[in-house]
């Protein structure tokens, strides 16, 4: 049985409430764009690809139920307004913003066709959102396979197995399935070339301890959980061959926004001479931004750092800074950026993808 973060059939969308994992596996119905926004904001669903999928599919559910209209102009306005609203839930991840732009443009173009009808435009928008699921899964499998083979050539050129360290959650729970960085680990395991995986707990939201560890145990992949503060020691003493992380936004020069804590992993990996990889679909690449300094970093509520499961663990009155992401400079991404289109050095990324994305 495969883990599913998203369950969808025409007119029905359910998400696995990831706030309850690993203690409970409970699916929650999402029947509107507003409900999707709230689920994304609360991090019941998370991971850049999954955010875009849930956002667009929630719109498809509303459209299937008859929302929008009457008339082409009103329908297009409804689609565009809904998509703009969804982008505000978690703005650092680019996938939702790109999907919103593309889908809004599609709706407008379809409405301008000669003989266009409200029913035809509605159907076209729904189908586009549904196609995202299949494409994401295909892309993730490509990322996993391309990344695994590139990593093996770099880290184990004489053969043998590798040990990989990863951060946050980038598996089936963050995507339509298989995963990005965790997909690379999965592919290595399927090839019989994975010695061991290390996953960080990923404070303050513990996505590594709650979600990645859950996936690794579920898939019976040999793995060990470590605290974030143990990563450099693991590189020094546990035979780590490579670090592979995901991304919420990769910009034109290769600077990468990912879960906070990624930057320090890249610094430690470079110090130890360990290749550091970013695994992300091309939909996570934003070539309109030149450097990471332009990325807007989301800041989360204080309570996510001061409280654990509703119990306060920090001294009352202490100040809190809680950014959800940090930016890893491109020169620290020494292994490469793994996409479904290939593995590229940061300086190669813009030329490689410019014909495909913007």
From Swiss-Prot:
For biological process, the GO terms are: L-methionine salvage from methylthioadenosine
- List, alphabetically, the InterPro entries matched: IF-2B-related (IPR000649), IF-M1Pi (IPR005251), IF_2B-like_C (IPR042529), Initiation_fac_2B_a/b/d (IPR011559), M1Pi_N (IPR027363), NagB/RpiA_transferase-like (IPR037171)
Quote the Pfam families the UniProt record gives: IF-2B
**Single GO cellular component annotation?**
cytoplasm
Which GO terms label this protein's molecular function in UniProt?
A: S-methyl-5-thioribose-1-phosphate isomerase activity
At the top level of its lineage, which domain of life is listed? Eukaryota
Main localization of the protein described in the UniProt heading:
cytoplasm
Name the enzyme's class.
Answer: isomerase
Record's catalysed reaction(s): 5-(methylsulfanyl)-alpha-D-ribose 1-phosphate = 5-(methylsulfanyl)-D-ribulose 1-phosphate
Residues modified as N-acetylmethionine are 1
Site feature (Transition state stabilizer) residues: 168
Q: Which residues form the active site?
A: 248
The pathway that the record names for this protein is:
Amino-acid biosynthesis; L-methionine biosynthesis via salvage pathway; L-methionine from S-methyl-5-thio-alpha-D-ribose 1-phosphate: step 1/6
Q: Does the keyword tRNA processing apply?
A: no
EC number(s): the record gives 5.3.1.23
Give the subcellular location.
Cytoplasm; Nucleus
Listed A to Z, the keywords are: Acetylation, Amino-acid biosynthesis, Cytoplasm, Isomerase, Methionine biosynthesis, Nucleus
The protein's matches in HAMAP family, at most eight in alphabetical order, are given as: Salvage_MtnA
Which protein family is named in the record? Belongs to the eIF-2B alpha/beta/delta subunits family. MtnA subfamily.
- Main role? Catalyzes the interconversion of methylthioribose-1-phosphate (MTR-1-P) into methylthioribulose-1-phosphate (MTRu-1-P).
- Protein name as annotated: Methylthioribose-1-phosphate isomerase
Which gene produces this protein? MRI1
């Amino acid at each position: 049985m495969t883990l599913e973060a998203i369950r969808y059939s025409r007119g029905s969308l359910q998400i696995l409430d990831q706030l309850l994992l690993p203690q409970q596996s409970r699916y929650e119905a999402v029947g509107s764009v507003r409900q999707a926004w709230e689920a994304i904001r609360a991090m019941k669903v998370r991971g850049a690809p999954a955010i875009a999928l849930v956002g667009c599919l929630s719109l498809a559910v509303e459209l299937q139920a008859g929302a929008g209209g009457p008339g082409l102009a009103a329908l297009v306005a409804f689609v565009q307004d809904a998509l703009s609203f969804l982008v505000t839930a978690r703005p650092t991840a680019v996938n939702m913003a790109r999907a919103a732009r593309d889908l809004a443009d599609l709706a407008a173009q379809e409405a301008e066709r000669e003989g266009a009808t409200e029913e035809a435009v509605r159907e076209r928008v729904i189908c586009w959102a549904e196609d995202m699921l299949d494409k994401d899964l295909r892309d993730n499998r490509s990322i996993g396979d391309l990344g695994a083979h590139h990593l093996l050539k770099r880290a184990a050129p004489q053969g043998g197995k590798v040990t990989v360290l990863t951060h946050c959650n980038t598996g089936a729970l963050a995507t339509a399935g298989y995963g990005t960085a965790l997909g690379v680990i999965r592919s290595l395991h399927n090839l019989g070339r994975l010695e061991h995986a290390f996953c960080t707990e990923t404070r303050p939201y513990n996505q590594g301890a709650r979600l990645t560890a859950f996936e690794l145990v579920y898939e019976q992949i040999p793995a060990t959980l470590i605290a974030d503060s143990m990563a450099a020691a693991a590189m020094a003493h546990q035979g780590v061959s490579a670090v592979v992380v995901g991304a919420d936004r990769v910009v034109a020069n290769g600077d990468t926004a990912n879960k906070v804590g990624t930057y320090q992993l890249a610094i430690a990996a470079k110090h130890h001479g360990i290749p550091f990889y970013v695994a992300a679909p091309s939909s996570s690449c934003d070539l309109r931004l030149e450097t990471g300094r332009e990325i807007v970093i989301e800041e989360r509520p204080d309570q996510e750092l001061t409280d654990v499961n509703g119990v306060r663990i920090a001294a009352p009155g202490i100040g809190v800074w809680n950014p959800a992401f940090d930016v890893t400079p491109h020169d620290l991404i020494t292994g490469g950026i793994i996409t479904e289109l290939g593995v590229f050095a940061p300086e190669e990324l813009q030329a490689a993808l410019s014909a495909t994305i913007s």
